[in-house]
């Protein structure tokens, strides 16, 4: 689950920065905010830009954020097994060998990240390696390799880009309507204060619409989890995948944050399933059992 939350947080930060830049460009270039086509074009450029910048930074940020130690040369039997298992699964899935790494954490989790299928990273926590059986860990690795093979990060990026575009677009449309409604005159002072109020309103609306839009992203994320589970069942075996999920259900709630969350094996619980990046484990097991 680590991967998606880090992605979303990075994307949000980039969106906020680009949103400020967008407002400045409107003023400098004299673009009419009421021009729907021009506004939509700019929002699309910056909306998709934020997503793709997050995507390109995803592997670098994952390594830095979680202290992932990439295995260059296996130093022990566990690392040998880890690298050889991922290599075998990558061949079977038809992708290039991902980088393989370990990060220090007591929780049982793993994630995959990377901008392309053939330039990816699969990382596992030390807690997973020492708490799971080899069969269970093999299924977890297969789940992450399936995320890479399915191109899930690129898919999420495209979805997030569309969501970003419409969040930015409708925030500015609604802010413009509100600003016009409360404008009583066009004197210089009113114009100056009105511009500031418009920017604040846009910021607040982007936050509000962003929360609502995240439900769309999370829904797609949950569908990709079911697909990754099915892929893992093919690569490692259905019984191993079910056993791994059952083992995860008995463990502590993961503490992953950021974009890593969606592409980890396990996700955080939420008051509402609408905001969960992963389906409940019992649903995932039921789907595997058919």
From Swiss-Prot:
Which source organism does the UniProt entry give? Answer: Aeromonas salmonicida (strain A449)
> Which cofactors go with this protein?
Zn(2+)
- The main location is membrane
The name on file for this protein is Protease HtpX
Question: Which cellular component appears as one GO term in the record?
Answer: plasma membrane
Q: What lineage is this protein's organism placed in?
A: Bacteria, Pseudomonadati, Pseudomonadota, Gammaproteobacteria, Aeromonadales
Gene symbol? htpX
Secreted recorded as keyword: no
Please report the record's description of how this protein sits within the membrane: Multi-pass membrane protein
The keyword Ribosomal protein is annotated on this UniProt entry? no
Its Enzyme Commission number(s) read: 3.4.24.-
- So where's the catalytic machinery, residue-wise? 144
Membrane-crossing residues?
A: 6-26, 36-56, 158-178, 200-220
């Amino acid at each position: 689950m680590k991967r998606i939350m880090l992605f979303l947080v990075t994307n949000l930060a980039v969106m906020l920065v680009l949103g400020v830049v967008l407002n400045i460009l409107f003023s400098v270039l004299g673009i009419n905010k009421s021009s729907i086509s021009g506004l939509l074009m700019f929002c699309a450029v910056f909306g998709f830009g934020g997503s793709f910048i997050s995507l390109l930074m995803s592997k670098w940020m994952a390594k830095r954020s979680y202290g992932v130690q990439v295995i260059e040369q296996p130093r022990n039997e566990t690392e040998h097994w880890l690298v050889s298992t991922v290599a075998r699964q990558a061949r079977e899935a038809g992708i290039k060998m991902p980088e393989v790494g370990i990060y220090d954490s007591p929780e049982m989790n793993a994630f995959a990240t990377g901008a392309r299928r053939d330039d990816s990273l699969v990382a596992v926590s030390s807690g997973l390696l020492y708490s799971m059986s080899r069969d269970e860990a093999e299924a977890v690795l297969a789940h992450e390799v399936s995320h890479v093979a399915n191109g899930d990060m690129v898919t999420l990026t495209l979805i997030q880009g569309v969501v970003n575009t419409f969040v930015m677009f409708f925030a500015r449309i609604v802010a413009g309507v509100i600003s016009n409604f409360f404008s009583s005159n066009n004197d210089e002072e009113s114009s100056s204060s009105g511009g500031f109020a418009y920017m604040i309103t846009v910021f607040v609306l982007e936050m509000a619409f962003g929360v609502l839009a995240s439900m769309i992203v999370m829904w797609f994320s949950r569908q990709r989890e079911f697909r990754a589970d099915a892929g893992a069942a093919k690569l490692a075996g259905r019984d191993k995948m079910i056993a791994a999920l059952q083992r995860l259900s008995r463990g502590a709630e993961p503490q992953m944050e950021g974009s890593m969350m969606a592409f980890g094996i396990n996700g955080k619980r939420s008051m509402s399933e609408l905001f969960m990046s992963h389906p409940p484990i019992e649903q995932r097991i039921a789907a595997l059992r058919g």
